């Protein structure tokens, strides 16, 4: 029986990991912060020895060094691969003019989405520090995407760059809107800011989905992922599917392809 793969998704806000067996089933998973101040280190002591680590890192060199230190402490000399977007991989063709410019997290997510929803046209919306959209045709062609500030970043920008508007977190904003979602307009400043930025997210998604369906002359499945997906979903008027495991699933496919090639 082959050893499992350790999968690591180092995003802008936190680091998620999973252990995938030979059937690409995630048998263990967790999350931790970029620094020790962000919470405890992952406890990998009970995990079986993986054959290697497959890493998507969009968080920079400091996080890469932290990951190396954690891996070396648990499994010295463990082989590790930091993935990069390619022109084509695992059934997905990259439509970027410079394929390597596409973030590794978005690339892994596209591969995961292609496997999760085969033979379907997809719009994948991920709500993190940034809100990203990817258009993926049923034949596996990624035709392009959009990047916008995330919900939290929108609200933080308004609070930081204006004199009288508050700086709100998504937790606070979500609570403010919990009793006000039926109202299209709000009657105080914190709720107006929370709802305005949330509707900006929803409006972007709905416009992109309608434009994509019109351009392709076919139905498009809207797939939502990320920390703010629940809040944005409640503001949407379009049908949608929630799937938060696309990046790790994509990493599992990339790891399996690499192991088969080796």
Swiss-Prot record:
Pathway: Cofactor biosynthesis; coenzyme A biosynthesis; CoA from (R)-pantothenate: step 1/5. The gene is coaX. Catalyzes the phosphorylation of pantothenate (Pan), the first step in CoA biosynthesis. This is Type III pantothenate kinase. It holds the Pfam family Pan_kinase. GO terms for molecular function: ATP binding; pantothenate kinase activity. One of its GO terms (biological process) is coenzyme A biosynthetic process. Homodimer. Its main location: cytoplasm. It catalyses: (R)-pantothenate + ATP = (R)-4'-phosphopantothenate + ADP + H(+). Its EC number is 2.7.1.33. Substrate binds at residues 96, 103-106, 189. Belongs to the type III pantothenate kinase family. ATP binds at residues 9-16, 129. The active site is at 105 (proton acceptor).
């Amino acid at each position: 029986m082959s050893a499992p793969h350790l999968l690591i998704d180092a995003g802008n806000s936190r680091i998620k990991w999973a252990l995938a067996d030979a059937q690409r089933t995630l048998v263990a998973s967790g999350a931790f912060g970029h620094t020790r101040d962000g919470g405890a280190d992952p406890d990998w002591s009970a995990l079986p020895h993986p054959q290697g680590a497959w890493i998507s890192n969009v968080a920079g060199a400091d996080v890469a060094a932290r990951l190396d230190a954690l891996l070396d402490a648990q499994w010295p000399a463990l082989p590790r691969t930091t993935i990069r977007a390619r022109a084509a991989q695992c059934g997905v063709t990259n439509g970027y003019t410079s394929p390597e410019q596409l973030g590794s997290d978005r690339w892994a997510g596209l591969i995961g989405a292609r496997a999760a929803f085969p033979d379907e046209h997809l719009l994948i919306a991920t709500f993190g520090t940034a809100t990203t959209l990817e258009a993926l045709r049923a034949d596996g062609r990624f035709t392009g995407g959009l990047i916008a500030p995330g919900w939290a970043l929108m609200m933080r920008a308004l609070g930081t760059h204006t004199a009288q508007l508050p700086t709100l977190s998504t937790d606070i904003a979500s609570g403010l809107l919990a009793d006000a979602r039926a109202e299209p307009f709000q009657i105080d400043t914190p709720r107006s800011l929370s709802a305005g930025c949330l509707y900006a997210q929803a409006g972007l998604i709905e416009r992109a989905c309608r434009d994509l369906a019109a351009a392709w002359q076919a139905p498009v499945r809207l797939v939502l992922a990320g920390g703010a997906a629940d809040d944005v979903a409640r503001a949407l008027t379009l049908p949608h599917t929630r799937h938060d495991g696309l990046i790790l699933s994509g990493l599992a496919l990339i790891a399996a392809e690499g192991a088969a090639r080796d």
